Curated annotation (Swiss-Prot):
Its EC number is 4.2.1.9. Homodimer. Pathway: Amino-acid biosynthesis; L-isoleucine biosynthesis; L-isoleucine from 2-oxobutanoate: step 3/4; Amino-acid biosynthesis; L-valine biosynthesis; L-valine from pyruvate: step 3/4. The gene is ilvD. This is Dihydroxy-acid dehydratase. It is an enzyme of class 4 (lyase). It comes from the Archaea.
Amino acid sequence: MRSGDIKEGVERTPHRALLRACGLTDEEMDRPFVAVVNTYSEVVPGHMHLDKVTEAVKAGIRMAGGVPFEVETIALCDGIAMNTPGMKYSLPSRELVADTIETVIEAHRFDGFVAIVSCDKMVPGALMAAARLDLPAAIVTGGPMEPGCVDGERVDLIDAFEAVGAYEEGEISEEELEELEQRACPGPGSCAGMFTANTMACMTEVLGMSEFNCAATPATEAEKLRVAKLTGMRIVEAIEEGITARDVLTREAFLDAIRVDMALGGSTNTVLHLLAIAREADVELSLDDFDELSRETPHLCAMRPGGPYTMRDLYEAGGVPAVMKELADDLHLDRIDFAGRSMRERVERTEVKDREVIRPKEDPVHEEGGIVVLYGNLAPKGAVIKTAALSEEMYEHEGPAVVFDSEEEATEAILGGDIDPGDVVVIRYEGPAGGPGMREMLTPTAALCGMGLDDSVALVTDGRFSGGTRGPCVGHVSPEAYRGGPIAVVEEGDTIRLDVRERRLEVDVEDEELEARLEEWEPPEDEVTGYLRRYRELVRGADEGAVLR
């Protein structure tokens, strides 16, 4: 066992003395040492129950003959950080999670680990660490939040964001706004729709790094604790069998994850995260894979924000295994999960229980996948749009650019009534390096929706979007403005064309004119300190997953 590095031999007497100080017995010294990475937090709804989930994982490890050691790393709530300077730390926190897990696992020579995570950047951060370390590893995702209820209608956090615009337009009263605030998020778990956290939980399950039906099992269900306990038992099996993360995280696993992502209509953030995890696993993956699989995979689940269904509905319909069953002919099901079990076994033991929630391939929500990759002179290295939450009337749009150099400027203009139907809102210098941190533009996009402009105004940015964003919103424009991408020199009134069916994003400016503008362009000067300064210097583009060099 790898943990022998700290517990075997005469020369390890002082090491064992320190372990004895932690209460270890002779019997435990002979067993596998398993790190249990807890991301419990009192300020993050998706993580405020993970102390109990962690205890269940530890119980499972003990039942199987291992020795659990609880360690911690950070957790952030994107919703709380949204539209503040704090949101600049969201995407960079993914790298911190990966680095801190790597650090503690390597320093203390654990034989394997289980990470208990829920929210947007914590899930991919844990997966990146698993791929990097290539040890026996498993993930337990904390589970979705239940939807709230107002006047008999189900609501969630995105309703609260969109209500701000509706209130500014006089569509709802202050009392209605406050009631939504009180009821949108009724308890623990990751926000109730197919937003980023839940999409990444689904990707984790498809990859084989979490237990059967872990992703859709709500945070409030006792089944979540049983899944956690079972994961603890099976990580000990993985250690005994020598199954490591890269045995699971193959190219076939990533292709399956992308295909299921397209069927679910998941968050565009999965593009960033799957590219980053694949890079850590030394697996070749690119935007071209997303583009190809988007063209040939139907969108099967009308999940919020692009439809009426929540994660609770997906859970009742059979969860991720049921979606995989519908796609089984196109998936690589002979690969293994983190404990060495066949993925085919998972699919064969499930069934689709609700055909409204999980549509048959012959009768999909859309013929093509829920995320589309765009190219053009405005995005030479690509951009993404979530068609699962886009009305077909906005698949083509042409309009004058209204240009902003920050999210705050754009939000003020939108809420101030300065955007007209037909416009294309351009928000730049919000990319990985430019922000720095590639903030999510949920506040401006939600404001457009709340003000009834989502069927007539497009938004284009080198920043990101929340998984809760809906409407004609194009993100991840690459190269980003701060690194000299064409979006840096778009001028007020330039005509921008979006054509989803043709996969194009263009600005109606001749190449020679764009080149001339870029020759005169200089990046803006701003003062960035601390971690964000180091992040800006090291981060790659969105088309590469915004990983560090």
